[in-house]
Amino acid sequence: MSVKRLLDCTPSDLAAYSKTDLLAAIAGSEGRVLACETIGLTPPLLVDVTNAEYAASLSTDILLLNMFDVQHPVINALPKVPEEETVREIKRLTGRVVGINLEPCDPQAAKSNDGTLWKMSSGRLATAENASRAADMGVDLIVLTGNPGNGVSNELIVESLKDISAAVGDRVMLAAGKMHASGVAGEGGEQIMTPADAEAFMVAGADI
């Protein structure tokens, strides 16, 4: 099957694409793919329209759902569907590639977020079980990363990548890396990701 650039894909194209096809479509877009992260737990900006749909209307190519619990998914303003259909409903409404974040966090460090928006839940942990459930729900991309204060180290990302790659690496695109230190001393600034970390991520199974 001929693969288009992601920039040229229709929703029906994306629905038919495999993981390999999606990676080729992204690569073919030469760095011009736009991803946007949204949080379904927070109130929608447009009240009765999901933030994912709003982001799609602003030309996002990949929707990344942060704080998405695969065991108890919540997307405010999404029409009522069975929990296992949550991701497929977002894809139906937006026609976009949909990914989620999973976090290989340090349980002790994550306790600092108890009582806050960032409080960890079992359905957000970077485990093979959660990744398999996400794949079954229709997720196209899993990003192994960390929210503020959850104690996600690059070493933990590598270890979870190995397990998740073995479980769903043939079905789902896997990405790895952090935008901030996630509460890990020594992994801020230039140390957020080093060339050695990038190599370790690739060896462990990261596609992106």
Where would I find each of the regions flagged by the language model?
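Alpha/beta enzyme core
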Residues: 47-71, 76-78, 112-208
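N-terminal amphipathic alpha-helix/helix-capping segment at the start of soluble metabolic enzymes
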Residues: 1-39, 49, 83-104, 112
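Structural motif
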Residues: 37-41, 67-68
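Glycine-rich nucleotide/cofactor/substrate-binding loop typically near the N-terminus or early
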Residues: 107
